[in-house]
C-alpha cells in the first residue's frame, strides 16, 4: 500500500535466487546468494516460453548432457531482469516429455540450471517494451554449453523447484497488486473529495457518484 514497488525488487530477486536457496549446492549458494542479499548481483528466473507460456510441462527448451557439460537449446520469454541479470535460473528438459492419455505432456524430466551472460550460445534475442519497473527480454540458447556444476539440484527436479519458488513469490506479487488497488482507490476518493469545480466538489457530481 505504501511502497508497492519494493515488492518488485523483492520478487524479481527472490524468483531468480530462490531455486539456489531451495536446491542449490553449497558452493553455488555461497557464490551467489550473499551477493544477491547485498545488492551486488541481479538474478533472473527463466521459465516461460513463447509457445508454452506458463504451461511448464509444455516447455520445449532442452539441455543435453555431454561429458562434463550440458548443451542448452531453446528460448525463454517475458523474463524479468532479462539483459541486466548477473545470472539466470533457466529451466529446460533433460529428458523427453512423457505424453498422458489425453495428449498433454507431463512435467517430469525438467531440470534447472544457472546460466551467466557471458556463456557462449546465450543471447538476449529481444528486449520487450512494457510498462514495468524492470526490463523484460526474450532469451535464446543455441548450443549453449555450461558446466555440469551449474545444475541446480538433481536432474528431473526442475518442475518441483519452479513450483516451490512460485508458491513463495506469487503470494507477494498478489499482495502488492491488492495494495496498489487499495491505494489507487483511496487516492481517487481523496482527489474527488478535495477537487473543486463549478462551485462543488468533484465527489458531488452524479457521474462521479455513479
Regions found by a protein language model. Name each.
Residues 61-64:
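A structural signal for short hydrophobic beta-strand segments in well-ordered beta-sheet cores
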Residues 51-59, 130:
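Active-site-adjacent elements of ketosynthase-type condensing enzymes
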Residues 1-30, 34-40, 81-87:
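Internal helix-loop-helix
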Residues 39-47:
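A short, Trp-centered hydrophobic/proline-enriched beta-strand micro-motif
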Residues 23-26, 66-68, 93-97, 117-120, ...:
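Short loop segments at secondary-structure junctions
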Residues 112, 122-210:
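Glycine-rich beta->alpha junctions and the first turn(s) of the following alpha-helix
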Amino acid at each position: 500500500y505504501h511502497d508497492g514497488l519494493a515488492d518488485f525488487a523483492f520478487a524479481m530477486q527472490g524468483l531468480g535466487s530462490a531455486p539456489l536457496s531451495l536446491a542449490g549446492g553449497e558452493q553455488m549458494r555461497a557464490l551467489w546468494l550473499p551477493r544477491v542479499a547485498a545488492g551486488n548481483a541481479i538474478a533472473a528466473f527463466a521459465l516461460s516460453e513463447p509457445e508454452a507460456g506458463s504451461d511448464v510441462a509444455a516447455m520445449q527448451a532442452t539441455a543435453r548432457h555431454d561429458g562434463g557439460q550440458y548443451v542448452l537449446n531453446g528460448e525463454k520469454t517475458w523474463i524479468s531482469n532479462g539483459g541486466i541479470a548477473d545470472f539466470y535460473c533457466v529451466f529446460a528438459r533433460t529428458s523427453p516429455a512423457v505424453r498422458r492419455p489425453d495428449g498433454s505432456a507431463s512435467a517430469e524430466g525438467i531440470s534447472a540450471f544457472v546460466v551467466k551472460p557471458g556463456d557462449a550460445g546465450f543471447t538476449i534475442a529481444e528486449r520487450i517494451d512494457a510498462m514495468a519497473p524492470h526490463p523484460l527480454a526474450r532469451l535464446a540458447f543455441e548450443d549453449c554449453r555450461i558446466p555440469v556444476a551449474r545444475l541446480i539440484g538433481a536432474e528431473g527436479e526442475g518442475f518441483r523447484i519452479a513450483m516451490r519458488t512460485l508458491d513463495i513469490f506469487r503470494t507477494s506479487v498478489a499482495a502488492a497488486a491488492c495494495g496498489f488497488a487499495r491505494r489507487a482507490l483511496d487516492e481517487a476518493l481523496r482527489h474527488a473529495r478535495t477537487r473543486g469545480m463549478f462551485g462543488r466538489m468533484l465527489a458531488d457530481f452524479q457521474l462521479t457518484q455513479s
